[in-house]
Structure formats: structure tokens, C-alpha cells
């Protein structure tokens, strides 16, 4: 469904999700990590998503784990978002093999290699990809898009956008 629904990475790169879910046979992936760090100033779309649709984030992670045949999932969220940590933890509390990780608030905590290390203690080899450490990383928005596609059959045609700063009252 991820391919037919046009699901792409919602963290910014728009990499096709179905490609991430088909690692080379020599890469033994056993973990999926969702990136909820959103460490760039003024960006709050992922934060709002985790507050308003935490169940979709968790459901999407379960679907990604099932697609890859893995048993372990993490959702990494920086500690400057305690409300999001609480909401996502509540949504995931009864789901086996999913752990919400409170990440130290620092830049660039949301970068793939830092996120993988913070959640699993594994290091991605220099010049390597997350699959070299047995991990696939997706954004929380990507997981929510997967959930929406599964639940409604709707392709990816929209995303959450936030507006912030001095010009907003």
C-alpha cells in the first residue's frame, strides 16, 4: 500500500518509503526508528502531529515493522516536547516491542546517525547507511501517512503545516 499510496519520507527528503522498506538481502534489518526529534528552530509540524494523532504514529510504526518483518521499534522524541512524549507513550503503552525514547535536546539529534545511536547504541559505519546497523529510520509524519493510507485508502496528498514567528498573533 505504501507504493500505491505514494508514501514518501515526510521529514523533508521525500525519499520513496517503499524503497526504504526493501533493504538489500545482505542487510539484516531488525529495528525501525521513528524520528520525532524535529530539532530545527521554528519547525513544529511533527510536534503537532504527535500531539493530535499519536495513535496514527504508533499504528504506522506497527505497519512499518510488519512490512520489514522486525520485532523492535523506537520513537525518538526530544525532551523539549514533554507533551508529545506523554501522548505518544500513552498511545504505545500497550503495544509490545515499541519503545518511546526521550532524547536529549541538542542539535543535530534528529540526524539519522545520531538518532540511531541515541535509541539503540549502534553506530552506522562511516560512509554506511542505517541498514548497515540493522535499522530503517522514518519520520513520525511518514508513519502517520502510512497509517492514514491503510485506514482510509487515501494516497499521500496532504501534510501538516505549521506557521510560527513574530508575524503570527
Which role fits each region the language model picked out?
Residues 1-116:
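Iron-sulfur-cluster electron-transfer modules
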Amino acid at each position: 500500500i505504501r507504493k500505491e499510496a505514494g508514501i514518501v519520507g515526510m521529514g523533508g527528503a521525500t525519499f520513496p518509503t517503499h524503497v526504504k522498506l526493501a533493504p538489500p538481502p545482505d542487510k539484516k534489518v531488525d529495528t525501525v526508528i521513528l524520528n520525532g526529534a524535529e530539532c530545527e528552530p521554528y519547525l513544529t509540524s511533527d510536534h503537532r502531529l504527535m500531539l493530535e494523532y499519536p495513535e496514527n504514529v504508533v499504528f504506522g510504526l506497527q505497519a512499518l515493522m510488519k512490512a520489514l518483518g522486525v520485532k523492535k521499534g523506537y520513537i525518538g522524541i526530544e525532551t523539549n516536547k514533554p507533551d508529545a512524549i506523554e501522548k505518544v507513550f500513552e498511545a504505545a503503552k500497550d503495544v509490545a516491542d515499541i519503545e518511546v525514547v526521550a532524547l536529549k535536546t541538542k542539535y543535530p539529534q534528529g540526524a539519522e546517525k545520531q538518532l540511531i545511536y541515541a535509541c539503540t547504541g549502534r553506530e552506522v559505519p562511516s560512509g554506511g547507511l542505517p541498514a548497515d546497523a540493522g535499522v530503517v529510520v522514518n519520520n513520525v509524519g511518514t508513519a502517520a501517512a502510512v497509517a492514514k493510507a491503510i485506514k482510509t485508502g487515501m494516497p499521500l496528498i496532504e501534510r501538516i503545516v505549521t506557521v510560527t514567528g513574530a508575524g503570527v498573533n
